[in-house]
Amino acid sequence: MRYGFVRKKHRGLFLTTVAALPIWNPISEFVKWYKSHKLSQHCIRICGHLCQKHLDMFLSVIGQRWPIDVFSSVFDHQVSAIGSDIIWWFLKLFLVSFFFFF
């Protein structure tokens, strides 16, 4: 039986490898960046069309469940890096969920 393009005997190894990737690090960096630099309305629209209240609730839950890493870089130099990390994190999340459900 096949799960996407990964055979059943290789599925555990594939999922273990994906799970070992540091997928929460970009989220913790984003939480730290958000808390130090309040997002503008334009950035809130980019981040999934969430209103300010829901975004605050979402980030507070993530901040309570996962430790926030030290994020010492300056905002202007890290905008593109944070955006690419968030996109990469969602891509990895999609891949894991794809292999669990299909």
Swiss-Prot record:
It is a multi-pass membrane protein. It is found in: Endoplasmic reticulum membrane. GO terms for cellular component: endoplasmic reticulum membrane. Keywords: Endoplasmic reticulum, Membrane, Transmembrane, Transmembrane helix. The keyword tRNA processing does not apply. It comes from the Eukaryota. Expressed in placenta with lower expression in brain, kidney and testis. The chain crosses the membrane at residues 13-33, 82-102. This is Protein PAPPAS. It comes from Homo sapiens.
